[in-house]
Amino acid sequence: MMLVKKAGITMMVHAENADMIAVLQKYYLDRGKTDPVYHYYSRPPVAEDEATSRAIYLAKMADCPLFVVHVSTKRAMEAIRDAHIAGQVVFGETCTHYLTLTTDCLAKPGFEGAKYVCSPPLCSQLH
């Protein structure tokens, strides 16, 4: 991020904790849990929340402008908002499917559920 700041550009990140996801993916795969809904279970909202907060802290340390893409959770959005209000140059964007669809779509039978696999995954309405 320091090099990005030095170059005068904005860092763009897709924020998900890859280590957390790798552990959960292995856990579900080892148990034969491969239905589309397990894409959500292996990438829980906390994976995005933690990675978004970490990116914000690192950007603050580097004094680097930050743009978080594909924001899908309330906590990630709140972290971006709070940092922005505090004066940090940080922005986020989301996609229509995160505002209109939920994990219920992933639970559809057969290939139908696979049509809704995206990353970060669709969340429940609570997130």
Regions found by a protein language model. Give the residues of each.
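Histidine/acidic residue-rich metal-binding segments in metalloenzymes
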Residues: 1-127
